[in-house]
Amino acid sequence: MNKFITLFVLLASVSVAMSATCLTCVKEGAVCDATANICEEGTVCIKPNSTAANTICFVLPTLNEDCSGPLACADSYYCNTTSKICVEAYYLGVGESCSSENQCSTSLVCTGGKCVNEVYPLCGASNSRVGCKAGEGCAFNGTALVCSPFIANGAACNTSTSGLCHPVSSCSNGVCTAPLTGALNSNCTSNTDCNIANGLYCSSGKCTAVPEALNNCTTTPTVDNCLGYSACMCPSNDDTAKTGSCKDTIEYSDVTSDAYNKYDSCVVSCPAVTIVQKQSCLSKCTNPLAGAANNVCSSATTIAFNAFVVFAIVLSVLLF
């Protein structure tokens, strides 16, 4: 899958248990361990300031609020390193209208009211699609990384040109391949290469059926009994439990080809940016995986994925 999968959140943050245990849900203000807990909706597990002894489930500041404590902002806003205020920054791409330079993505300048890559058609300092126009990818032409139009699904691709496949597609077996097209036992490099709606995910390079949920699971950094898009949740939120039950973190049937086709069309029509914020073109593109997310905690939209899920629903898409 292309580099855009640093992609996603709209609703969630990823947490992977670091010891053999199950995951529990934690309320705002409570001490948390990002390797074993899931903070409730609207909070993240972070030290609220540099002198805090513990990480807690904390509500991050948002636009125009003080971020001097956590040095991070909600809604993908940028914590200005000087003012320590959450601001809009780096959210516009090549060709979009700007009034100040910090609106443009890093490596771009605001010239004549537009965000410009001064070395175009070279991809520029970002070495990514951020230096390219909407409808273009960044690929090696034998000499340098240059911006070129995307190539269609079904067209030939290789290591050098894989960056020209659509951002939500992958270069699989030498062909730009649309997501969700992989049948059982077909080759894959990412979960989204497989037909998720049919309960498939990518395991050891093959589209594989998600097994029946386990009722006696544990999670470690390298081994997770829960496979596919699932999390090992402790029974009755009991933080003394050592085993739990696998809970689906998405509604598999909701992740359809039609939804991905719409997502693909939206992403291709927008320029890439350093940070996707509310004013970014990409903010209107809803990843179907985010739309299909389940709340594994009754009051939480923060989701824990197992160690093998190469997917993060985050709204900061640095290499989209």
From Swiss-Prot:
Organism superkingdom: Eukaryota
Major site of localization recorded for this protein: membrane
Gene Ontology terms: biological process: cell adhesion
Keyword line: Cell adhesion, Cell membrane, Developmental protein, Disulfide bond, Glycoprotein, GPI-anchor, Lipoprotein, Membrane, Signal
Lipid-anchored residues (GPI-like-anchor amidated serine): 298
Membrane-topology annotation of the record: Lipid-anchor; GPI-anchor
N-terminal signal peptide: 1-19
Modification after translation, per record: Contains 18 disulfide bonds.
Subcellular location per the Swiss-Prot or TrEMBL entry: Cell membrane
Glycosites: 49, 80, 141, 158, 187, 216
GO cellular component, one term: side of membrane
Function: Cell-cell adhesion during development.
Misc: Loss-of-function mutant (antisense inhibition) shows reduced cell adhesiveness and forms smaller aggregates than wild-type, though it does complete development and produce fruiting bodies.
Protein name: Cell-cell adhesion glycoprotein 64
Upper taxonomic lineage: Eukaryota, Amoebozoa, Evosea, Eumycetozoa, Dictyostelia
Gene: gp64
